[in-house]
């Protein structure tokens, strides 16, 4: 009887020890990550179907998500540091020049204008980073019935003047009374990003169009600039990405955040968006929204 008891006790111990392996592995992995900040570590366990193995699998999935967030934050820090370095260097150089070398008020004024311009660039960059962070955090937008046609008409009026000042032809063809469910401020921001992009790169003309079908509203912004290669077309929605082409040469191309912001706004509205372009043939940015009947909203 004592032998049988000891055997049962031993079997129970082994069973409990084996059952607790996933817990021990999770604890060990969590401690290693806490000490090393290495989010690439995972729980290495043989396949199993019990609850603890399922928990270990969920733990690994959580680590996958944490690693993506961690890498994204590292990349954002690197990108922001890079983007801020140039304007800050210019500001410091111009400040030193104005203080030590400028011989007259005119030279000092030129330096101050450069400093002011670069300071505004930094402010704009920070504002866009904060806006993108809020969008990526998935904050809830207040969506209501809005008239997309009216939004585009207002923007068209503004950009017609801006295009004219640059010697560009601006045309628009906007279908009337296109009603969608959305946030008016965010939709205006999306279209404004498309239009400011076109204003920057167009050679002679910009087109703003809105067409409707039975269920969809399709807006598009075309320019006749240098265009975008197929490779770049797949990447331009990424943060801080700027196409490496003649499109960017000799131009102050901005922060590289405008299209990333537009992509997040479209996602929050359940809208499709994309670009049609090829190098040397201009670009057409588009977004497609589902139409609604405001009387039923």
Model-flagged regions — what are they?
Residues 24, 49, 53, 144-160, ...:
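A conserved beta-strand-to-alpha-helix junction within the catalytic ATP-binding
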Residues 204, 270-271:
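Conserved glycine-rich
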Residues 223:
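Acidic ATP/Mg2+-coordinating residue in the GHKL
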Residues 137-142, 179-182:
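Conserved micro-motifs of the catalytic ATP-binding
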Residues 44-46, 144-145, 164, 169-179:
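Conserved catalytic submotifs in the C-terminal HATPase_c
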Residues 205-215:
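Short beta-strand/loop element within the Bergerat-fold HATPase_c
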Residues 198-199:
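Short helix-loop "hinge" at the ATP-lid/N-box region of the Bergerat-fold HATPase_c
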Residues 1-80, 84, 89-100, 104-106, ...:
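Membrane-proximal HAMP signal-relay module
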